């Protein structure tokens, strides 16, 4: 059995880890970072960039750079108006009212975009481990709906991963914290504020059991919202100073977003920071520059409502667990946004104790997912751990009068199954419509509908006589199945809830195959880019030789070498050339350079050779003739990881 990786698929950044020798290890990406930006970009010629490479070119390619896709996954069009207004890329209605992303002449589902990020993490893990990776544990916010969980699982399948388990992010963080504290009985509060979501979970740890007591949260609150507060302030200040509205300028907005994120990070360690964006725009009087000073106190004033919004879920989670604040033994801060001093102070005041800082807030969730992978893979060091998670929202049916009747209450331990008996609402009724909802509101339509199906063939009878058993079954991933059985006839109907407007198994397989093809195409493009870098070094060596010694070369020799050089130059701009063809032309050019180097040596060193020993002459000739190739090899080595991009990199 191969390694099972743990993935924290975040709104702004993602992280991958694995259990090695019983210890969780964060896997660095190809660029050397321990986290990878959850960003996908499409270049001018259709090339796909993921992670740091995509982030670097976002300013000059804002419309084709996709970020915060996690805010759209598994959600319907009408639910995402606010999020759609905040991104520069085009969102379009997808199938069954879901959200798709339009890039030039093609649309992508959020699952496909997420799969591209997952595929990058998978490739980095394979490079690190030196073996194929096919299985993973992926984390989601505790307050993710059934539809969002299923969509995340679909994204994993598209990326070529068998998702063994979907677990909640706060629960994963508790595993990272408690892996070496299994002998301690304690109640912990996990405060998880990431880039786009916020969760609070209360867990009971002891004797190798990690039991979630309750969970609460807000899927619309995260670090992105703090960034947007700064962006809105910058827009207002600049409009007041210069009379220019930057809100419709996508390139300027992307620069403001990056500057806002940078300022937010800096204000976690300093009391004031400068935001300087030269040439942000221009009018008839010339270019305009944005120069502003942002203090921590001003930042906290701008974001005070966001900080306060974290209070209610904490109160709810503690109440649902049947505890008081005083009974909380430890408070864990998870997610990069918990570095904001105002957040730390609020948590400290609410809980009456300093938060525990023993886990890395950026890496804890991925580490916990890797530990869960070890549990599923029966790793010796963790095989006896038991993780008991809960469902974050109540699940039930619409009954007579549009009332929402709960079958499974929120914070029920998973996996679980519950059956409730219903009857018909009118005489002679032969069909029952079963509408499944998720939420806490008393009226069904105010909650999120997950599915709707019919049980037919019910024997005609007076109202209230037929007995229909409806069973709700939630697996360990938090994914729901519903079945209905008529006791009299034995007729049964069931449905495994996948998000309405979600992907069928055939669509997932098609997208998975496309992702594999794209991965192969991307690999070929990377290989061609690397070969062209090597070829460029050879051409440079040729041009240098001609510049310094061309006058001494015979026309016949130049006529013989020139077609080889021209063939190599043509390969540098041919979009349809294959790696094998480039290698073939490079070999021809290398042979030509060896010949050229030998002739140059004989012409420049011929006089001294007459007085040198034959052995020295041969050694000198060998050195001179291969000098070009040696320098070329050095250049090749230095450019191993180079990727050609059409866009300017802006740090």
Curated annotation (Swiss-Prot):
It comes from Thermosynechococcus vestitus (strain NIES-2133 / IAM M-273 / BP-1). The gene is dnaK1. Signal peptide: none annotated. Keywords: ATP-binding, Chaperone, Nucleotide-binding, Phosphoprotein, Stress response. This is Chaperone protein dnaK1. Acts as a chaperone. GO terms for molecular function: ATP binding; ATP-dependent protein folding chaperone; unfolded protein binding. InterPro entries: ATPase_NBD (IPR043129), Chaperone_DnaK (IPR012725), Heat_shock_70_CS (IPR018181), HSP70_C_sf (IPR029048), HSP70_peptide-bd_sf (IPR029047), Hsp_70_fam (IPR013126). The modification Phosphothreonine is found at residue 197.
């Amino acid at each position: 059995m191969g390694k099972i990786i743990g993935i924290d698929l975040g709104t702004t950044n993602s992280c991958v880890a694995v259990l090695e020798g019983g210890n969780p290890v964060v896997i660095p990406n190809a660029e050397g970072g321990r986290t990878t930006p959850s960003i996908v970009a499409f270049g001018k010629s259709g090339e796909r960039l993921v992670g740091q490479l995509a982030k670097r070119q976002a300013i000059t390619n804002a419309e084709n750079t996709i970020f915060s896709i996690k805010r759209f996954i598994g959600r319907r069009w009408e639910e995402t108006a606010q999020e759609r207004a905040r991104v520069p890329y085009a969102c379009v209605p997808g199938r069954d009212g879901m959200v798709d992303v339009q890039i030039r002449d093609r649309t992508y589902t959020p699952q496909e975009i997420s799969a591209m990020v997952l595929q990058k993490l998978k490739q980095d893990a394979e490079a690190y481990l030196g073996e194929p990776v096919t299985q993973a544990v992926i984390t989601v916010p505790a307050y993710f709906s059934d539809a969002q969980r299923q969509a995340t699982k679909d994204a994993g399948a598209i990326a070529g991963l068998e998702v063994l388990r979907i677990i909640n992010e706060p629960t994963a963080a508790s595993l990272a914290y408690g892996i070496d504290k299994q002998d301690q009985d304690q109640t912990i509060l996990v405060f998880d504020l990431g880039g786009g979501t916020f969760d609070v979970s209360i867990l009971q740890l002891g004797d190798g059991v990690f039991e979630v007591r309750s969970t609460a949260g807000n899927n619309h609150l995260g670090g992105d919202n703090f960034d947007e507060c700064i962006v809105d302030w910058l827009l207002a200040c600049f409009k007041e100073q210069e009379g220019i509205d930057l809100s419709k300028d996508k390139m300027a907005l992307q620069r403001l977003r990056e500057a806002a994120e940078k300022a937010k990070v800096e204000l976690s360690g300093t009391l004031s920071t400068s935001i300087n964006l030269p040439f942000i725009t221009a009018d008839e009087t010339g270019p305009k520059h944005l120069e502003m000073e942002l203090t921590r106190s001003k930042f906290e004033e701008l974001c005070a409502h966001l900080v306060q919004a974290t209070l209610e879920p904490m109160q709810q989670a503690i109440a649902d667990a049947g505890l008081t604040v005083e009974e909380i033994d430890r408070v864990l801060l998870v997610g990069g946004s918990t570095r904001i001093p105002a957040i730390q102070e609020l948590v400290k005041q609410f809980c009456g104790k300093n938060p525990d800082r023993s886990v890395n807030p950026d890496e804890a969730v991925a580490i916990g997912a890797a530990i869960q992978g070890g549990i599923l893979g029966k790793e010796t060091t963790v095989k006896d751990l038991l993780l008991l998670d809960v469902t974050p929202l109540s699940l039930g049916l619409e009954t007579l009068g549009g009332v929402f009747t709960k079958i499974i209450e929120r914070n029920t331990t998973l996996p679980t199954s519950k059956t409730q008996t219903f009857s018909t609402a009118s005489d002679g009724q032969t069909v029952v419509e079963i509408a499944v909802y998720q939420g806490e509101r008393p009226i069904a339509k105010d909650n999120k509908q997950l599915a709707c199906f019919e049980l037919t063939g019910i024997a005609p009878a007076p109202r209230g006589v037929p007995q229909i058993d409806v069973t709700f079954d939630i697996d360990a991933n938090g994914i729901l199945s519903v079945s209905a059985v008529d006791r009299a006839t034995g007729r049964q109907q069931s449905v495994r809830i996948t998000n309405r407007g979600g992907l069928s198994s055939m669509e997932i397989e098609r997208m998975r195959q496309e992702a594999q093809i794209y991965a192969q195409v991307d690999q070929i493009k990377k290989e061609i880019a690397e070969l062209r870098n090597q070829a460029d070094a050879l051409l440079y060596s040729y041009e240098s030789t001609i510049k310094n010694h061309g006058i001494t070369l015979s026309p016949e020799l130049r006529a013989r070498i020139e077609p080889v050089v021209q063939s190599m130059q043509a390969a540098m701009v041919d979009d349809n050339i294959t790696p094998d063809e480039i290698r073939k032309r490079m070999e021809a050019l290398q042979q030509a350079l060896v010949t050229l180097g030998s002739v140059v040596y004989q012409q420049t060193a011929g006089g001294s050779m007459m007085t040198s020993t034959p052995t020295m002459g041969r050694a000198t000739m060998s050195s001179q003739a291969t000098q070009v190739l040696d320098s070329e090899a050095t250049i090749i080595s230095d450019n191993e990881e180079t990727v050609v991009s059409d866009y300017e990199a802006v740090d």
